[in-house]
Amino acid sequence: MKTILKFAAIALSMVSLSGCLAGKYMSNYALKPEVHGVADIERTRHKADSLMPGSTKWYDELKAEGVLKDTTIVGYRDFKVHACYVPAKDPDHAQGTAIVVHGYGDNHLVFLYLVRMYRDDFNYNVLFPDLQYHGYSEGDHIQMGWNDRYDIEKWIPVAHDIFEDDFMVLHGVSMGAATVMMTSGDELPEYVRCFVRTAATAQPGTSSHSISMTASTCLRSRC
């Protein structure tokens, strides 16, 4: 009987250990992908152009003209985080400012079609950051939105200082949508007036019209 119990205890320990090791592996796989950050820029440029052809050309031209700029701040847990920002197409008549937040495994480049929509169609200033462990931002793992909200809350006054608007919208996609929704539950400046979330499957050519309608409805509701 003692022998049976001994083997049962050993078997149970092995199962528990295997479960712990598997859990750690899956956690690292999800939160610490090997290819990330700067090493992943080229892939995301292709993804941006697959979502809307010509996106990176538009981005590169504005950057070459000095219209689109980069900036960094010290974010959550003292990691440096990066963002790009661009003024409205007609800056003197800008309608507000949008912060566009990307999803899991992406960076500021992927959803350029949203940046372009806000800037060129809605005449909004836009700031679009890299979340931690993405793009040009530092970080030791993906934050899955919950802690990313602290960085977004730091970007909000930065964008306000740059553009000096009295109306701001936060628009997130996938994990970025989760980030935006969790940010919306915190105490924010009164000029943050609108929150838009988009599913990861929403793409131009299929559901971009609904994205535009959702955003424009939100923007028209400003008071």
Language-model regions, residue ranges each:
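Alpha/beta-hydrolase active-site loop
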Residues: 141-163
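A short loop-to-beta-strand scaffold at the N-terminal edge of the catalytic core in hydrolase folds
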Residues: 76-88
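An N-terminal hydrophobic leader/cap segment in hydrolases
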Residues: 20-74
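The serine-hydrolase catalytic nucleophile loop
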Residues: 104-118
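Short beta-strand element of the alpha/beta-hydrolase
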Residues: 94-103
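Conserved alpha/beta-hydrolase
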Residues: 115-138
